[in-house]
Protein backbone atom coordinates (compact mmCIF):
# COMPACT_ATOMS: atom_id res chain seq x y z
CA UNK A 1 0.00 0.00 0.00
CA UNK A 2 2.85 2.48 0.69
CA UNK A 3 3.40 4.88 -2.16
CA UNK A 4 0.47 3.56 -4.19
CA UNK A 5 -1.52 6.30 -5.85
CA UNK A 6 -2.92 7.32 -9.22
CA UNK A 7 -1.96 10.48 -11.06
CA UNK A 8 -4.79 12.88 -11.89
CA UNK A 9 -4.21 14.53 -15.25
CA UNK A 10 -3.16 18.11 -14.70
CA UNK A 11 -4.14 18.04 -11.03
CA UNK A 12 -2.37 15.50 -8.87
CA UNK A 13 1.40 15.69 -8.97
CA UNK A 14 4.17 13.43 -7.77
CA UNK A 15 4.76 13.05 -4.03
CA UNK A 16 6.58 15.83 -2.27
CA UNK A 17 9.47 14.23 -0.42
CA UNK A 18 7.78 10.83 -0.38
CA UNK A 19 9.69 8.31 1.62
CA UNK A 20 9.19 5.14 3.56
CA UNK A 21 6.39 6.64 5.65
CA UNK A 22 5.95 8.31 8.99
CA UNK A 23 6.93 6.35 12.04
CA UNK A 24 3.78 5.08 13.66
CA UNK A 25 1.67 6.54 10.85
CA UNK A 26 -1.70 4.87 10.48
CA UNK A 27 -3.99 7.36 8.73
CA UNK A 28 -4.12 9.22 5.44
CA UNK A 29 -5.49 12.77 5.61
CA UNK A 30 -6.73 15.28 3.10
CA UNK A 31 -5.32 18.67 4.10
CA UNK A 32 -7.17 21.66 2.66
CA UNK A 33 -5.10 24.78 2.00
CA UNK A 34 -6.55 28.23 2.56
CA UNK A 35 -7.48 29.95 -0.70
CA UNK A 36 -4.36 31.71 -1.98
CA UNK A 37 -2.12 30.22 0.71
CA UNK A 38 1.58 29.75 0.11
CA UNK A 39 2.14 26.11 -0.77
CA UNK A 40 5.59 25.89 0.81
CA UNK A 41 4.18 27.27 4.06
CA UNK A 42 1.45 24.61 3.98
CA UNK A 43 3.94 21.81 3.33
CA UNK A 44 6.11 23.07 6.19
CA UNK A 45 3.07 23.07 8.48
CA UNK A 46 2.32 19.47 7.54
CA UNK A 47 5.88 18.41 8.34
CA UNK A 48 5.89 20.33 11.60
CA UNK A 49 2.67 18.55 12.61
CA UNK A 50 4.32 15.17 11.99
CA UNK A 51 2.92 14.46 8.54
CA UNK A 52 4.37 13.51 5.18
CA UNK A 53 2.91 14.79 1.91
CA UNK A 54 2.40 11.92 -0.52
CA UNK A 55 0.25 13.59 -3.18
CA UNK A 56 -1.04 17.00 -4.20
CA UNK A 57 -4.20 18.10 -6.00
CA UNK A 58 -3.18 21.58 -7.07
CA UNK A 59 -6.50 22.38 -8.74
CA UNK A 60 -8.41 21.92 -5.49
CA UNK A 61 -5.69 23.12 -3.15
CA UNK A 62 -5.37 19.86 -1.24
CA UNK A 63 -2.50 17.74 0.04
CA UNK A 64 -2.79 14.04 0.75
CA UNK A 65 -0.79 13.40 3.90
CA UNK A 66 0.26 10.32 5.83
CA UNK A 67 0.51 10.87 9.59
CA UNK A 68 -0.04 9.39 13.01
CA UNK A 69 -3.66 9.69 14.03
CA UNK A 70 -3.16 11.24 17.44
CA UNK A 71 -3.52 15.02 17.35
CA UNK A 72 -2.47 15.62 13.74
CA UNK A 73 -5.64 17.47 12.68
CA UNK A 74 -5.38 19.96 15.52
CA UNK A 75 -1.68 20.57 15.02
CA UNK A 76 -1.79 21.12 11.27
CA UNK A 77 -4.97 23.22 11.40
CA UNK A 78 -3.22 25.73 13.66
CA UNK A 79 -1.29 27.02 10.63
CA UNK A 80 -2.68 30.10 8.87
CA UNK A 81 -1.99 28.34 5.55
CA UNK A 82 -4.32 25.46 6.38
CA UNK A 83 -8.12 25.63 6.26
CA UNK A 84 -8.59 22.17 7.76
CA UNK A 85 -7.86 18.45 7.57
CA UNK A 86 -9.94 15.29 7.45
CA UNK A 87 -9.33 11.58 7.29
CA UNK A 88 -9.02 10.65 3.64
CA UNK A 89 -8.41 6.89 3.87
CA UNK A 90 -7.37 4.55 6.68
CA UNK A 91 -4.00 2.92 6.08
CA UNK A 92 -3.28 1.31 9.42
CA UNK A 93 -4.55 -1.74 11.26
CA UNK A 94 -8.33 -1.64 11.66
CA UNK A 95 -11.00 -4.30 12.15
CA UNK A 96 -12.04 -6.00 8.92
CA UNK A 97 -15.23 -4.29 7.83
CA UNK A 98 -17.67 -4.05 4.97
CA UNK A 99 -20.19 -1.29 4.46
CA UNK A 100 -23.69 -2.77 4.70
CA UNK A 101 -25.97 -2.65 1.64
CA UNK A 102 -29.04 -4.31 3.14
CA UNK A 103 -31.54 -2.15 1.25
CA UNK A 104 -30.08 -2.95 -2.13
CA UNK A 105 -30.12 -6.74 -1.63
CA UNK A 106 -33.41 -7.04 0.26
CA UNK A 107 -34.92 -9.75 -1.95
CA UNK A 108 -34.92 -13.03 -0.11
CA UNK A 109 -35.21 -15.49 -2.93
CA UNK A 110 -38.22 -14.99 -5.18
CA UNK A 111 -37.20 -16.05 -8.65
CA UNK A 112 -40.37 -14.71 -10.26
CA UNK A 113 -39.62 -12.42 -13.19
CA UNK A 114 -41.98 -11.35 -15.96
CA UNK A 115 -40.77 -12.90 -19.21
CA UNK A 116 -42.03 -10.08 -21.43
CA UNK A 117 -41.68 -9.80 -25.19
CA UNK A 118 -38.57 -8.78 -27.13
CA UNK A 119 -38.81 -5.28 -28.57
CA UNK A 120 -37.13 -4.10 -31.77
CA UNK A 121 -34.00 -2.11 -30.97
CA UNK A 122 -33.73 -3.73 -27.57
CA UNK A 123 -31.77 -6.64 -26.11
CA UNK A 124 -33.09 -10.06 -25.00
CA UNK A 125 -33.42 -9.24 -21.29
CA UNK A 126 -34.77 -5.72 -21.83
CA UNK A 127 -38.34 -6.97 -21.48
CA UNK A 128 -37.54 -7.28 -17.77
CA UNK A 129 -36.31 -3.68 -17.56
CA UNK A 130 -39.47 -1.86 -16.56
CA UNK A 131 -37.25 1.08 -15.68
CA UNK A 132 -36.30 1.61 -19.34
CA UNK A 133 -39.97 1.80 -20.25
CA UNK A 134 -40.81 4.10 -17.34
CA UNK A 135 -38.24 6.65 -18.52
CA UNK A 136 -39.17 5.92 -22.17
CA UNK A 137 -35.64 5.06 -23.25
CA UNK A 138 -37.15 2.42 -25.54
CA UNK A 139 -38.74 5.25 -27.54
CA UNK A 140 -35.95 7.80 -27.19
CA UNK A 141 -33.31 5.56 -28.76
CA UNK A 142 -35.17 5.67 -32.06
CA UNK A 143 -34.32 9.37 -32.17
CA UNK A 144 -31.18 9.55 -30.03
CA UNK A 145 -29.43 6.45 -28.63
CA UNK A 146 -26.48 8.51 -27.43
CA UNK A 147 -23.21 9.56 -29.04
CA UNK A 148 -19.81 8.02 -28.49
CA UNK A 149 -18.43 11.52 -28.08
CA UNK A 150 -20.48 11.88 -24.88
CA UNK A 151 -18.47 10.57 -21.94
CA UNK A 152 -20.20 9.47 -18.74
CA UNK A 153 -18.16 8.99 -15.58
CA UNK A 154 -19.14 6.33 -13.06
CA UNK A 155 -17.74 7.39 -9.67
CA UNK A 156 -18.21 4.13 -7.84
CA UNK A 157 -16.57 0.77 -7.05
CA UNK A 158 -15.21 0.17 -10.56
CA UNK A 159 -16.69 -1.31 -13.73
CA UNK A 160 -16.35 -4.88 -14.99
CA UNK A 161 -15.37 -4.19 -18.59
CA UNK A 162 -15.29 -7.91 -19.44
CA UNK A 163 -19.08 -7.97 -19.59
CA UNK A 164 -20.09 -8.03 -23.28
CA UNK A 165 -22.70 -5.34 -22.58
CA UNK A 166 -20.08 -3.01 -21.09
CA UNK A 167 -17.08 -3.75 -23.31
CA UNK A 168 -18.25 -1.94 -26.50
CA UNK A 169 -18.76 1.34 -24.65
CA UNK A 170 -15.92 1.23 -22.12
CA UNK A 171 -13.10 3.78 -22.45
CA UNK A 172 -9.88 2.07 -21.33
CA UNK A 173 -7.74 5.11 -22.05
CA UNK A 174 -9.62 7.59 -19.87
CA UNK A 175 -10.64 5.24 -17.05
CA UNK A 176 -8.79 5.55 -13.73
CA UNK A 177 -8.79 3.96 -10.28
CA UNK A 178 -8.32 6.51 -7.48
CA UNK A 179 -8.92 4.06 -4.63
CA UNK A 180 -6.15 1.50 -4.08
CA UNK A 181 -7.24 -1.49 -2.02
CA UNK A 182 -6.80 -1.32 1.74
CA UNK A 183 -6.14 -4.91 2.87
CA UNK A 184 -7.36 -4.24 6.40
CA UNK A 185 -10.86 -3.45 5.13
CA UNK A 186 -10.91 -4.83 1.58
CA UNK A 187 -9.22 -8.17 2.15
CA UNK A 188 -6.19 -9.68 0.47
CA UNK A 189 -4.99 -7.73 -2.57
CA UNK A 190 -5.49 -9.62 -5.84
CA UNK A 191 -3.24 -7.35 -7.91
CA UNK A 192 0.28 -5.97 -7.65
CA UNK A 193 0.60 -2.88 -5.50
CA UNK A 194 -2.94 -3.35 -4.16
CA UNK A 195 -4.29 -1.38 -7.12
CA UNK A 196 -7.09 -3.07 -9.03
CA UNK A 197 -6.74 -2.43 -12.77
CA UNK A 198 -9.38 -0.38 -14.52
CA UNK A 199 -12.12 -2.56 -15.93
CA UNK A 200 -12.32 -4.57 -12.69
CA UNK A 201 -14.98 -4.50 -9.97
CA UNK A 202 -15.07 -6.69 -6.86
CA UNK A 203 -18.13 -5.00 -5.36
CA UNK A 204 -20.53 -5.14 -8.32
CA UNK A 205 -22.17 -1.83 -7.42
CA UNK A 206 -20.38 0.25 -10.05
CA UNK A 207 -20.92 -2.33 -12.79
CA UNK A 208 -24.66 -2.42 -12.03
CA UNK A 209 -24.82 1.38 -12.21
CA UNK A 210 -22.81 1.48 -15.45
CA UNK A 211 -25.08 -1.03 -17.18
CA UNK A 212 -28.19 0.99 -16.39
CA UNK A 213 -26.56 4.10 -17.83
CA UNK A 214 -25.02 2.72 -20.98
CA UNK A 215 -25.06 -1.04 -21.61
CA UNK A 216 -24.76 -1.55 -25.37
CA UNK A 217 -27.49 -2.79 -27.70
CA UNK A 218 -25.70 -5.85 -29.03
CA UNK A 219 -28.12 -8.76 -29.05
CA UNK A 220 -26.98 -9.98 -25.62
CA UNK A 221 -28.32 -9.33 -22.13
CA UNK A 222 -29.57 -5.82 -21.38
CA UNK A 223 -29.23 -2.34 -22.79
CA UNK A 224 -28.88 0.95 -20.95
CA UNK A 225 -30.83 4.19 -20.99
CA UNK A 226 -28.19 5.70 -23.30
CA UNK A 227 -26.80 2.62 -25.09
CA UNK A 228 -24.33 4.38 -27.39
CA UNK A 229 -22.51 6.71 -24.97
CA UNK A 230 -18.99 6.14 -23.67
CA UNK A 231 -18.55 4.82 -20.13
CA UNK A 232 -15.56 6.01 -18.10
CA UNK A 233 -14.58 4.41 -14.80
CA UNK A 234 -13.46 7.00 -12.25
CA UNK A 235 -13.27 4.67 -9.31
CA UNK A 236 -13.43 6.23 -5.88
CA UNK A 237 -14.81 3.28 -3.91
CA UNK A 238 -13.21 0.47 -1.96
CA UNK A 239 -14.04 -3.21 -2.52
CA UNK A 240 -15.70 -3.10 0.91
CA UNK A 241 -18.14 -0.42 -0.23
CA UNK A 242 -16.65 2.65 1.43
CA UNK A 243 -16.04 5.88 -0.49
CA UNK A 244 -13.58 8.11 1.31
CA UNK A 245 -12.92 11.81 0.79
CA UNK A 246 -9.54 11.75 -0.97
CA UNK A 247 -10.40 9.36 -3.82
CA UNK A 248 -13.77 11.05 -4.37
CA UNK A 249 -12.35 14.57 -4.66
CA UNK A 250 -9.53 13.36 -6.92
CA UNK A 251 -12.05 11.60 -9.18
CA UNK A 252 -14.22 14.71 -9.46
CA UNK A 253 -11.20 16.85 -10.31
CA UNK A 254 -10.16 14.36 -12.97
CA UNK A 255 -13.69 14.37 -14.43
CA UNK A 256 -13.39 18.09 -15.01
CA UNK A 257 -9.84 17.90 -16.35
CA UNK A 258 -10.53 15.27 -19.03
CA UNK A 259 -13.88 16.66 -20.16
CA UNK A 260 -16.41 14.14 -18.89
CA UNK A 261 -19.96 15.26 -19.69
CA UNK A 262 -21.94 13.60 -16.89
CA UNK A 263 -20.87 11.92 -13.64
CA UNK A 264 -23.07 9.56 -11.64
CA UNK A 265 -22.62 9.51 -7.86
CA UNK A 266 -24.62 6.76 -6.15
CA UNK A 267 -23.08 7.05 -2.67
CA UNK A 268 -22.39 9.27 0.30
CA UNK A 269 -18.89 10.22 1.42
CA UNK A 270 -17.80 8.08 4.37
CA UNK A 271 -17.59 8.05 7.32
CA UNK A 272 -20.37 10.61 8.06
CA UNK A 273 -23.93 10.20 6.76
CA UNK A 274 -24.38 13.89 7.55
CA UNK A 275 -21.48 16.32 7.75
CA UNK A 276 -22.21 19.12 10.22
CA UNK A 277 -20.36 22.35 10.81
CA UNK A 278 -20.60 22.25 14.62
CA UNK A 279 -22.80 19.44 15.92
CA UNK A 280 -22.75 19.52 19.77
CA UNK A 281 -22.85 15.72 19.77
CA UNK A 282 -19.47 15.59 18.00
CA UNK A 283 -16.02 16.11 19.48
CA UNK A 284 -14.10 19.24 18.42
CA UNK A 285 -11.89 17.08 16.19
CA UNK A 286 -14.92 15.42 14.56
CA UNK A 287 -16.47 18.84 13.98
CA UNK A 288 -13.28 20.08 12.34
CA UNK A 289 -13.12 16.98 10.15
CA UNK A 290 -16.68 17.44 8.93
CA UNK A 291 -16.13 21.11 8.13
CA UNK A 292 -13.14 20.09 6.03
CA UNK A 293 -15.17 17.42 4.21
CA UNK A 294 -17.86 20.00 3.40
CA UNK A 295 -15.31 22.51 2.11
CA UNK A 296 -13.30 19.97 0.10
CA UNK A 297 -16.40 18.45 -1.50
CA UNK A 298 -17.75 21.92 -2.28
CA UNK A 299 -14.50 22.78 -4.05
CA UNK A 300 -14.50 19.50 -5.99
CA UNK A 301 -18.14 19.76 -7.08
CA UNK A 302 -17.72 23.39 -8.10
CA UNK A 303 -14.56 22.51 -10.03
CA UNK A 304 -16.26 19.73 -11.98
CA UNK A 305 -19.29 21.92 -12.71
CA UNK A 306 -17.12 24.81 -13.94
CA UNK A 307 -15.46 22.38 -16.32
CA UNK A 308 -18.74 21.31 -17.90
CA UNK A 309 -19.64 18.20 -15.88
CA UNK A 310 -23.32 17.52 -15.15
CA UNK A 311 -23.46 15.99 -11.67
CA UNK A 312 -26.18 13.49 -10.74
CA UNK A 313 -26.54 11.97 -7.26
CA UNK A 314 -28.75 9.54 -5.38
CA UNK A 315 -30.88 10.94 -2.54
CA UNK A 316 -30.06 8.00 -0.27
CA UNK A 317 -31.79 5.00 1.27
CA UNK A 318 -32.52 6.22 4.79
CA UNK A 319 -36.30 6.71 4.26
CA UNK A 320 -36.31 10.26 5.52
CA UNK A 321 -37.14 13.79 4.45
CA UNK A 322 -33.70 15.31 3.96
CA UNK A 323 -35.13 18.68 4.95
CA UNK A 324 -36.29 17.24 8.29
CA UNK A 325 -33.59 14.68 9.13
CA UNK A 326 -33.88 12.26 12.01
CA UNK A 327 -31.16 11.52 14.54
CA UNK A 328 -28.19 9.95 12.76
CA UNK A 329 -27.49 6.57 14.36
CA UNK A 330 -25.01 5.25 11.78
CA UNK A 331 -22.12 7.71 11.88
CA UNK A 332 -19.27 7.46 11.83
CA UNK A 333 -19.62 4.21 9.91
CA UNK A 334 -15.86 3.71 9.98
CA UNK A 335 -14.15 2.26 11.93
CA UNK A 336 -16.85 -0.30 12.64
CA UNK A 337 -18.55 0.01 16.01
CA UNK A 338 -17.82 3.71 16.56
CA UNK A 339 -21.24 5.19 15.65
CA UNK A 340 -23.19 7.19 18.22
CA UNK A 341 -26.51 9.12 18.20
CA UNK A 342 -26.22 12.52 16.53
CA UNK A 343 -29.23 14.88 16.36
CA UNK A 344 -29.10 16.52 12.93
CA UNK A 345 -29.76 20.22 12.36
CA UNK A 346 -30.93 20.72 8.79
CA UNK A 347 -29.50 24.25 8.67
CA UNK A 348 -25.93 23.19 9.48
CA UNK A 349 -25.68 19.55 8.30
CA UNK A 350 -25.50 18.14 4.76
CA UNK A 351 -25.56 14.72 3.11
CA UNK A 352 -22.74 14.72 0.56
CA UNK A 353 -22.49 14.72 -2.36
CA UNK A 354 -26.24 15.00 -3.05
CA UNK A 355 -26.70 18.14 -0.93
CA UNK A 356 -23.59 19.73 -2.38
CA UNK A 357 -23.63 22.44 -5.07
CA UNK A 358 -24.80 21.63 -8.60
CA UNK A 359 -25.83 18.04 -7.83
CA UNK A 360 -29.12 16.82 -9.33
CA UNK A 361 -30.79 14.78 -6.57
CA UNK A 362 -32.79 11.69 -7.56
CA UNK A 363 -35.37 9.75 -5.53
CA UNK A 364 -36.31 6.11 -6.19
CA UNK A 365 -39.60 4.68 -7.44
CA UNK A 366 -40.98 1.17 -7.71
CA UNK A 367 -42.54 -0.21 -10.91
CA UNK A 368 -45.94 1.15 -9.83
CA UNK A 369 -44.37 4.66 -9.81
CA UNK A 370 -44.84 4.81 -6.03
CA UNK A 371 -41.99 6.23 -3.96
CA UNK A 372 -40.01 3.24 -2.72
CA UNK A 373 -40.25 2.81 1.05
CA UNK A 374 -36.48 3.17 1.58
CA UNK A 375 -36.01 6.28 -0.59
CA UNK A 376 -35.14 9.64 0.89
CA UNK A 377 -37.25 12.57 -0.30
CA UNK A 378 -37.97 16.23 0.42
CA UNK A 379 -38.58 19.48 -1.44
CA UNK A 380 -35.28 21.05 -0.37
CA UNK A 381 -33.01 18.49 -2.00
CA UNK A 382 -34.88 16.62 -4.74
CA UNK A 383 -34.78 17.54 -8.42
CA UNK A 384 -36.23 14.49 -10.17
CA UNK A 385 -37.32 10.89 -9.57
CA UNK A 386 -36.48 7.68 -11.43
CA UNK A 387 -36.88 3.89 -11.27
CA UNK A 388 -34.88 2.46 -8.38
CA UNK A 389 -36.74 -0.77 -7.70
CA UNK A 390 -38.95 -1.71 -4.79
CA UNK A 391 -39.14 -5.34 -3.74
CA UNK A 392 -42.30 -4.71 -1.70
CA UNK A 393 -44.25 -2.96 -4.46
CA UNK A 394 -47.72 -4.21 -5.50
CA UNK A 395 -48.91 -5.34 -2.09
CA UNK A 396 -51.86 -7.72 -2.36
CA UNK A 397 -50.89 -9.03 -5.81
CA UNK A 398 -48.70 -11.94 -6.98
CA UNK A 399 -46.04 -9.37 -7.90
CA UNK A 400 -45.49 -8.39 -4.23
CA UNK A 401 -41.98 -9.25 -3.01
CA UNK A 402 -40.73 -10.56 -6.36
CA UNK A 403 -37.46 -9.97 -8.17
CA UNK A 404 -39.34 -8.46 -11.10
CA UNK A 405 -39.84 -5.35 -8.96
CA UNK A 406 -36.07 -4.78 -8.79
CA UNK A 407 -33.60 -3.32 -11.27
CA UNK A 408 -31.76 -5.84 -13.44
CA UNK A 409 -28.35 -4.78 -14.74
CA UNK A 410 -24.84 -5.95 -15.50
CA UNK A 411 -22.83 -7.58 -12.71
CA UNK A 412 -19.32 -9.07 -12.36
CA UNK A 413 -19.09 -12.86 -12.43
CA UNK A 414 -16.29 -12.77 -9.82
CA UNK A 415 -18.63 -11.03 -7.36
CA UNK A 416 -21.41 -13.54 -7.99
CA UNK A 417 -18.93 -16.38 -7.48
CA UNK A 418 -17.65 -14.86 -4.24
CA UNK A 419 -21.23 -14.85 -2.94
CA UNK A 420 -22.02 -18.41 -4.04
CA UNK A 421 -24.44 -17.34 -6.77
CA UNK A 422 -22.28 -18.68 -9.62
CA UNK A 423 -20.12 -21.78 -9.37
CA UNK A 424 -16.48 -22.27 -10.37
CA UNK A 425 -17.54 -23.36 -13.86
CA UNK A 426 -19.52 -20.18 -14.42
CA UNK A 427 -22.96 -21.73 -13.99
CA UNK A 428 -25.72 -20.18 -11.90
CA UNK A 429 -26.28 -21.93 -8.58
CA UNK A 430 -29.78 -22.53 -7.16
CA UNK A 431 -29.21 -19.62 -4.78
CA UNK A 432 -28.15 -17.45 -7.69
CA UNK A 433 -31.29 -18.26 -9.64
CA UNK A 434 -33.49 -17.64 -6.59
CA UNK A 435 -31.88 -14.27 -5.92
CA UNK A 436 -32.23 -13.08 -9.51
CA UNK A 437 -28.85 -13.73 -11.14
CA UNK A 438 -28.93 -14.34 -14.90
CA UNK A 439 -26.40 -15.26 -17.58
CA UNK A 440 -26.23 -14.79 -21.33
CA UNK A 441 -23.37 -15.62 -23.69
CA UNK A 442 -22.74 -14.17 -27.15
CA UNK A 443 -23.21 -16.66 -29.97
CA UNK A 444 -20.42 -19.23 -30.12
CA UNK A 445 -18.85 -18.21 -26.79
CA UNK A 446 -18.00 -21.10 -24.46
CA UNK A 447 -15.59 -19.32 -22.08
CA UNK A 448 -17.82 -18.17 -19.24
CA UNK A 449 -15.56 -15.20 -18.45
CA UNK A 450 -16.65 -13.71 -21.80
CA UNK A 451 -20.35 -14.15 -21.04
CA UNK A 452 -22.66 -11.53 -19.60
CA UNK A 453 -23.85 -11.84 -16.02
CA UNK A 454 -26.72 -9.84 -14.54
CA UNK A 455 -28.22 -9.26 -11.12
CA UNK A 456 -31.13 -7.44 -9.48
CA UNK A 457 -30.75 -4.66 -6.91
CA UNK A 458 -32.84 -1.80 -5.56
CA UNK A 459 -31.97 1.61 -4.17
CA UNK A 460 -31.59 5.26 -5.00
CA UNK A 461 -28.22 4.02 -6.33
CA UNK A 462 -30.24 2.38 -9.10
CA UNK A 463 -32.46 5.45 -9.67
CA UNK A 464 -29.62 7.91 -10.15
CA UNK A 465 -28.14 6.12 -13.21
CA UNK A 466 -31.52 6.23 -14.97
CA UNK A 467 -31.40 10.02 -14.61
CA UNK A 468 -27.72 10.06 -15.59
CA UNK A 469 -28.55 8.14 -18.76
CA UNK A 470 -31.22 10.66 -19.69
CA UNK A 471 -28.78 13.50 -19.01
CA UNK A 472 -26.29 11.81 -21.36
CA UNK A 473 -28.97 11.64 -24.07
CA UNK A 474 -29.65 15.36 -23.59
CA UNK A 475 -25.96 16.14 -24.11
CA UNK A 476 -25.95 13.83 -27.14
CA UNK A 477 -28.95 15.58 -28.68
CA UNK A 478 -28.17 19.23 -27.93
CA UNK A 479 -24.47 19.37 -27.11
CA UNK A 480 -21.85 20.94 -29.32
CA UNK A 481 -18.17 20.64 -29.94
CA UNK A 482 -15.97 22.35 -27.39
CA UNK A 483 -12.22 22.51 -26.77
CA UNK A 484 -11.06 18.97 -26.13
CA UNK A 485 -14.22 17.28 -27.35
CA UNK A 486 -18.00 17.53 -27.09
CA UNK A 487 -20.21 18.94 -24.40
CA UNK A 488 -22.98 21.10 -23.01
CA UNK A 489 -23.46 23.59 -20.19
CA UNK A 490 -24.47 21.45 -17.18
CA UNK A 491 -27.03 24.05 -16.06
CA UNK A 492 -28.78 23.71 -19.43
CA UNK A 493 -28.67 19.91 -19.15
CA UNK A 494 -30.29 20.11 -15.75
CA UNK A 495 -33.00 22.48 -16.93
CA UNK A 496 -33.98 20.20 -19.81
CA UNK A 497 -33.91 17.15 -17.55
CA UNK A 498 -36.30 18.83 -15.11
CA UNK A 499 -38.48 20.64 -17.67
CA UNK A 500 -39.20 17.44 -19.60
CA UNK A 501 -39.78 15.18 -16.59
CA UNK A 502 -43.25 13.60 -16.26
CA UNK A 503 -45.07 15.59 -13.56
CA UNK A 504 -46.61 13.51 -10.78
CA UNK A 505 -48.83 14.74 -7.99
CA UNK A 506 -48.49 13.69 -4.37
CA UNK A 507 -50.58 10.67 -3.39
CA UNK A 508 -54.01 11.31 -1.90
CA UNK A 509 -53.87 11.35 1.07
CA UNK A 510 -50.35 12.82 1.01
CA UNK A 511 -49.15 10.76 4.00
CA UNK A 512 -47.88 7.52 2.51
CA UNK A 513 -47.73 4.62 4.95
CA UNK A 514 -45.99 1.30 4.38
CA UNK A 515 -47.70 -0.74 7.09
CA UNK A 516 -49.03 -3.33 4.64
CA UNK A 517 -45.53 -3.74 3.27
CA UNK A 518 -44.28 -4.61 6.75
CA UNK A 519 -42.62 -1.32 7.62
CA UNK A 520 -42.89 0.49 10.99
CA UNK A 521 -44.24 4.03 11.34
CA UNK A 522 -40.72 5.43 10.94
CA UNK A 523 -41.09 4.77 7.20
CA UNK A 524 -44.25 6.91 6.90
CA UNK A 525 -43.58 9.71 4.40
CA UNK A 526 -45.46 12.99 3.95
CA UNK A 527 -45.44 14.32 0.41
CA UNK A 528 -45.41 18.11 0.25
CA UNK A 529 -45.71 20.33 -2.80
CA UNK A 530 -47.65 20.64 -6.04
CA UNK A 531 -48.11 18.41 -9.06
CA UNK A 532 -45.33 20.29 -10.82
CA UNK A 533 -42.89 19.97 -7.93
CA UNK A 534 -43.07 17.95 -4.73
CA UNK A 535 -40.93 16.05 -2.28
CA UNK A 536 -41.54 12.56 -3.72
CA UNK A 537 -41.11 13.20 -7.45
CA UNK A 538 -39.34 16.55 -7.64
CA UNK A 539 -40.08 18.03 -11.05
CA UNK A 540 -41.23 14.58 -12.15
CA UNK A 541 -40.04 11.21 -13.45
CA UNK A 542 -37.17 11.62 -15.90
CA UNK A 543 -38.35 11.14 -19.49
CA UNK A 544 -35.79 10.31 -22.17
CA UNK A 545 -38.27 10.57 -25.04
CA UNK A 546 -39.56 13.99 -24.01
CA UNK A 547 -36.01 15.18 -23.39
CA UNK A 548 -34.70 14.36 -26.88
CA UNK A 549 -37.82 15.46 -28.79
CA UNK A 550 -38.54 18.79 -27.07
CA UNK A 551 -39.06 21.84 -29.24
Where are these regions (language model features)?
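Autoinhibitory propeptides
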Residues: 43-127, 367
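Structural recognition of the beta-strand scaffold that forms the well-ordered cores
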Residues: 30-31, 64, 151-155, 211, ...
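Mature extracellular/periplasmic domains of secretome proteins
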Residues: 141-147, 223-226, 242-265, 275-281, ...
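C-terminal subdomain of the subtilisin-like protease fold in secreted/lumenal serine endopeptidases
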Residues: 54-55, 91, 260-267, 445-446, ...
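Extracellular S/T/G-rich loop segment that most often corresponds to the catalytic His/Ser-adjacent loop
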Residues: 336-472, 545-546
Amino acid sequence: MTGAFVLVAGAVVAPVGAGAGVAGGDTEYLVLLEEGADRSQAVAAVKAAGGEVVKENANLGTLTVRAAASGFVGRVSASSAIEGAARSRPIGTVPRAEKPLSVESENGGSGKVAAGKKVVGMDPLDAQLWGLRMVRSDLARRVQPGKKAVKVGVLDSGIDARNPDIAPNFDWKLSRNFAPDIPEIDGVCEFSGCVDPVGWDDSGHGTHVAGTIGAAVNGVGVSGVAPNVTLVEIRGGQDSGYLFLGPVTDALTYAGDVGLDVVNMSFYVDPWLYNCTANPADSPEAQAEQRTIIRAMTRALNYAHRHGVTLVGSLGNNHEDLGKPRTDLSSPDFPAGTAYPRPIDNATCVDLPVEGPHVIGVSALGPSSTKADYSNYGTEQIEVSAPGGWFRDFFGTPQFRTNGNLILSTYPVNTLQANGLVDAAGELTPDGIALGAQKQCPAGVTDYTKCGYYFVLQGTSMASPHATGVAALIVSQYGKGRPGGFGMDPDKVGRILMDTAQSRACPNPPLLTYTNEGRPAEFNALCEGTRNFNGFYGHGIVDAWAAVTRR
